């Protein structure tokens, strides 16, 4: 069984179904509303667990939300370490239009600090892969990659949202999983880059190969990128080649876009 350690944001995701997106100064009435726990790292943790991995997750929540988040993680088979903070949990508003495209606004809320990583060191040390993203403070990711380097753990990094990163992170990452916009911001990095291309699939930078996605009717693309990163991490941790892992990640992402919202869309491994 692959052992995956994931650090990320966890908070309340609020979904609004809209006929189209706003223009400046416009108010639109939503056709539906749904909420769930989410965040990039949180989504990736649940997705990896549903793929059969042993998942350890580190995140920060408002103290009032620690119990329900722990309960949800336990139900999904995710071993969660939650840093309870004296502030509100993070939240995100996700608008989805009639063709399944999304617009997302995030309020960070409760945030990890580097010392929170100290209590997660054992999970990193025993992991086959560490998965990180940019929804947590840079100093937290630095602390995590330093442990990964110390224990010789491969690092997958989903550089979203896009931002510049220090050399200590750039040098430690084994595989990056940006989308096309994030890839342009990432530039040249030592590790392998697998760029997600939406309905077109993904591209492996070192070979230039585009691996096509399976045909799918897009209902909601919100969780597709997190599904891709999680499945890629699990398959690489299991020893698959990068190309084979990309094929599996593409397939899982195609499944995810056909289901509304994130948690219901994260596929279970057959």
Question: Predicted segment positions?
Answer:
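Gly/Ala-rich phosphate-binding loop of Rossmann-like dinucleotide-binding domains
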Residues: 49-50, 149, 237
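Ribokinase/PfkB-type carbohydrate-kinase core domain
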Residues: 1-10, 70-84, 94-210
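Glycine-rich phosphate/adenosyl-contacting loop at the front of the ribokinase-like
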Residues: 1-58, 67-68, 218-219
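Electropositive, gly/pro-rich neighborhoods at or near active sites that engage anionic ligands
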Residues: 60-61, 87, 264-265
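Short, basic and Ser/Thr-rich N-terminal targeting/leader segments
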Residues: 51, 76, 87-90
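Conserved phosphate-binding/catalytic region of the ribokinase-like
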Residues: 4-5, 186-270
């Amino acid at each position: 069984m692959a052992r995956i350690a994931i650090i990320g944001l966890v908070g309340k995701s609020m979904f609004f179904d809209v006929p189209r997106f706003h223009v400046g100064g416009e108010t639109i009435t939503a056709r539906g509303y749904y909420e769930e726990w989410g965040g990039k790292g949180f989504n990736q943790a649940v997705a990896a667990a549903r793929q059969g991995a042993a998942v350890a997750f580190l995140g920060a929540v408002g103290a009032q939300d620690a119990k329900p988040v722990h309960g949800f993680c336990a139900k999904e088979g995710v071993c969660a370490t939650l840093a309870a903070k004296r502030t509100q949990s993070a939240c995100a508003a996700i608008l989805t239009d009639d063709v399944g495209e999304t617009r997302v606004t995030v309020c960070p809320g409760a945030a990890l600090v580097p010392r929170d990583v100290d209590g997660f060191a054992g999970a990193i040390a025993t992991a086959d892969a560490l998965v990180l993203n940019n929804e947590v403070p840079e100093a937290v990711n630095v602390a995590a990659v330093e442990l990964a380097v110390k224990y010789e753990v491969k690092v997958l990094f989903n550089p979203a949202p896009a931002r510049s990163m220090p050399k200590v992170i750039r040098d430690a990452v084994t595989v990056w999983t940006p989308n096309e916009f994030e890839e342009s911001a990432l530039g040249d990095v030592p590790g392998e880059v697998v760029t997600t291309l939406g309905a077109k699939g993904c591209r492996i930078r070192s070979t230039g190969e585009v691996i096509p996605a399976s045909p799918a009717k897009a209902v909601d693309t919100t969780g597709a990128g997190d599904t891709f990163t999680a499945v890629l991490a699990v398959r690489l941790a299991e020893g698959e080649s990068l190309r084979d892992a990309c094929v599996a990640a593409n397939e899982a992402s195609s499944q995810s876009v056909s289901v509304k919202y994130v948690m219901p869309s994260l596929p279970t491994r057959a």
